[in-house]
C-alpha cells in the first residue's frame, strides 16, 4: 500500500477533531453497550436527528446540501439523507463530541448518559445504516488502517492477548501520515502519543463523504472488538511498520498491533 511521505508541515487537527479520533481508547474493557432503549423505533428523520445536537436550521440546511452533493457524485448507491448523516459526523461540530462521549461514558446518577443516548438514538440508527452502504475495508486485501491519538495509555489494558471493545464510532485512516495530525510533536522531531495499526475486517471507508476527504477516513461501527497482538518496543520495529513516520523520533510513541475480532 502506498503512503504519502510525512513532513514537518503536516496540518494540526483542531482540539475537537483530536477528540473524535481519540475518544474511547482509555477504558476499552467495559464490553459492548446497548444504544437503543427497549422498544425503540425510529421517530426522527436525519435532519431532526441532527437537530438533537443543537445545530441551527441554517447549519442543518448546509449539511443536507453537502450530503446531497456528495450523494449525487457517489460511486456507490446512497440516499442524500444517509450521505448527510455521514458528512455531519466528520464535521468540526459538537455532534461527534457529544455523541461519542455519551456512547463511551457509563451512565451514573450524576452523569446520566443513558438519557443522552435516548436523544441520540435516531442519529445512531441513521449513521449505522449509512455505514452499511459504504465499502468495507478488509485489511487482508487493502492493508491495515491506522489510528493516532495524543494520549499514552495504560499498558496493562492494552497488553498483548487482551480483548478490547471500542463502544463508540471509531475513526481510523488508510494513510500513515494522517496520524501525525493527531499526535503530539515535541522538540527534536519527537512524536508522543499512541498509534494503533489495525487489521480490519468490517470497517467502512467513508472518505468520499467526509468534510476532510484527504484523511481517507475508515470508521469502525459501535461495539467493534479487537485483540492486541503485539506492542512494538524498539525504534527499529516501529520504523518497519510506520515507514512514513521514519523521519521522526518514535521513542515516546506507543505502537500497538490490533486484529479486529468483532
What are these regions (language model features)?
Residues 1-68:
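Intrinsically disordered, low-complexity, charge-biased terminal/linker regions in eukaryotic proteins
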Amino acid at each position: 500500500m502506498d503512503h504519502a511521505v510525512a513532513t514537518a508541515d503536516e496540518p494540526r487537527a483542531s482540539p475537537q477533531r483530536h477528540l473524535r479520533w481519540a475518544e474511547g481508547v482509555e477504558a476499552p474493557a467495559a464490553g459492548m453497550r446497548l444504544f437503543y432503549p427497549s422498544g425503540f423505533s425510529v421517530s426522527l428523520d436525519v435532519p431532526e436527528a441532527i437537530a438533537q445536537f443543537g445545530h441551527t436550521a441554517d447549519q442543518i440546511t448546509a449539511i443536507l446540501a453537502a450530503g446531497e452533493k456528495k450523494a449525487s457524485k457517489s460511486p456507490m448507491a446512497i440516499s442524500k439523507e444517509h450521505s448527510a448523516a455521514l458528512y455531519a459526523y466528520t464535521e468540526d461540530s459538537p455532534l461527534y463530541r457529544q455523541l461519542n462521549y455519551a456512547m463511551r461514558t457509563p451512565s451514573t446518577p450524576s452523569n446520566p448518559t443513558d438519557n443522552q443516548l435516548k436523544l441520540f438514538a435516531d442519529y445512531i440508527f441513521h449513521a449505522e445504516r449509512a455505514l452499511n452502504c459504504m465499502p468495507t475495508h478488509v485489511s487482508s486485501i487493502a492493508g491495515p488502517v491506522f489510528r493516532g491519538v495524543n494520549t499514552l495509555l495504560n499498558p496493562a489494558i492494552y497488553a498483548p492477548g487482551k480483548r478490547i471493545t471500542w463502544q463508540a464510532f471509531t475513526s481510523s485512516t488508510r494513510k500513515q501520515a494522517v496520524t501525525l495530525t493527531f499526535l503530539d510533536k515535541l522538540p527534536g522531531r519527537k512524536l508522543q502519543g499512541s498509534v494503533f495499526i489495525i487489521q480490519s475486517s468490517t470497517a467502512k471507508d467513508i472518505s468520499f463523504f467526509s468534510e476532510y476527504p484527504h484523511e481517507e477516513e475508515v470508521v469502525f461501527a459501535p461495539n467493534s472488538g479487537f485483540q492486541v497482538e503485539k506492542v512494538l518496543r524498539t525504534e527499529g520495529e516501529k520504523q518497519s511498520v510506520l515507514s512514513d513516520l521514519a523521519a521522526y523520533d518514535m521513542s515516546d510513541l506507543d505502537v500497538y498491533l490490533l486484529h479486529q475480532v468483532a
